[in-house]
């Protein structure tokens, strides 16, 4: 008998991300079983756009990146979480890799490379790529930690981690 596919929650923290959020949410369409957006009182259309993609939007003050991301994870219904920033999107290859993991994960967390777009150019040098990130994890084995704003996923001891093909596309710099 084949195990059923795991359900996947996607978490995103936001503040005035109307220019990014649709691209991010479009990239997880057909992959996410639940989307939780924790918004820090945006004054633009971030919340409305997120809701138009079916996201559950929770508004609360911003206590810091780590605290806000852990709060978002705590609001999810499923054990498996894909944590994204609003200025990120999945490449098609990464999306396919995650779909394979949904059929039966072998590890408690997964790394993949993040590729940054700087003013319209993909940066694959200067130490910016590969930029390995652990963003897909079983929340029973992981928590956000580190120092704000440089958050990292801290896995429980003896947790196993794998690596997925495909890039997390990072659109953080629109201009110089």
Predicted region positions:
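Acidic helix N-cap motif at the loop->helix transition within catalytic regions
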Residues: 22, 44-53, 93-94
């Amino acid at each position: 008998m084949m195990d059923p596919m795991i359900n996947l929650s996607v978490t995103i923290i936001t503040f005035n991300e109307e220019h990014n959020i649709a691209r991010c949410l479009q990239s997880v369409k057909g992959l996410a079983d639940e989307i939780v957006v924790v918004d820090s009182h945006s004054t633009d259309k971030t919340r409305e756009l997120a809701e138009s993609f079916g996201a559950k939007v929770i508004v609360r003050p911003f206590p810091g990146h780590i605290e806000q991301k852990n709060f978002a994870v705590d609001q999810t219904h499923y054990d498996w979480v894909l944590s994204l920033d609003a200025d990120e999107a999945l490449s098609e290859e990464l999306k396919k890799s995650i779909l394979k993991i949904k059929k039966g994960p072998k590890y408690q967390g997964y790394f993949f490379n993040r590729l940054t777009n700087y003013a319209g150019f993909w940066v694959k040098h200067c130490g910016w790529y590969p930029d390995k990130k652990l963003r897909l994890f079983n929340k029973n084995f992981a928590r956000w930690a580190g120092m704000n704003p440089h958050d990292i996923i801290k896995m429980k001891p003896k947790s196993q981690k794998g690596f997925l093909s495909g890039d997390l596309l990072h659109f953080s710099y629109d201009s110089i």
